[in-house]
């Protein structure tokens, strides 16, 4: 079930104005803020549907973000990437990359993030850099996000990185690299 809500709804009052969509596993309802403009509104529906199908039924946690917050950036970026790819295929369009000032993304001022996404742009920039380092397409991140049992998706990603680290003599551990990619824009 998909339900659109306004600023008087309990979801808005509990979660605030920054939340565009919310998946409630108990009621099996996806809540979407009704004031979102298109195409973002439709994309948020696909985004939340994707979260619903990547949820571990044993613990209601989503994607590779099972044991800690390490996978959150990757999970949200690849979920938005998936949602926008679905939207693009349905409507037969593609989105151009944009340069977005970091102050528009609740980041430190005077930077620029490059992304074609309409949400989670700063995470998408990190995902793009990680894809280049690993030599994988962004669709790889979508595929590992369903490997949530025993953190297999995150382990697979870290293993790929460790292989590349040894091959290219990279100086950083996987977690330090994620931190660097998150803060360098």
Give the positions of each predicted feature.
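Active-site-proximal structural scaffolding
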Residues: 38, 72-76, 120-123
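Active-site recognition of the HExxH zinc-binding catalytic motif
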Residues: 43-60, 76, 80, 84
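Low-complexity, repetitive regions of proteins mediating host interaction that are extracellular
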Residues: 15-18, 67-68, 178
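A generic hydrophobic-helix recognition signal that picks specific residues
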Residues: 40-44, 69
């Amino acid at each position: 079930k998909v339900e659109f809500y306004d600023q008087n709804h309990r979801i808005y009052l509990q979660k605030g104005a920054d939340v565009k969509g919310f998946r409630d596993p108990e009621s099996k309802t996806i809540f979407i803020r009704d004031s979102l403009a298109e195409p973002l509104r439709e994309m948020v529906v696909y985004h939340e549907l994707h979260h619903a199908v990547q949820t571990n039924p044993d613990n209601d946690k989503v994607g590779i973000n099972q044991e800690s917050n390490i996978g959150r950036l990757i999970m949200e970026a690849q979920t938005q990437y998936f949602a926008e790819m679905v939207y693009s295929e349905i409507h037969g369009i593609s989105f151009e990359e944009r340069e977005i000032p970091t102050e528009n993304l609740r980041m430190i001022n005077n930077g620029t993030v490059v992304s074609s996404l309409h949400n989670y742009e700063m995470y998408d920039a990190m995902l793009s850099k990680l894809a280049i380092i690993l030599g994988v397409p962004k669709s790889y991140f979508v595929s590992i996000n369903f490997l949530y049992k025993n953190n297999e998706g995150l382990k697979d990603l870290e293993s790929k990185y460790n292989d590349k680290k040894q091959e290219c003599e990279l100086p950083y551990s996987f977690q330090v690299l994620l931190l660097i990619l998150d803060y360098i824009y």
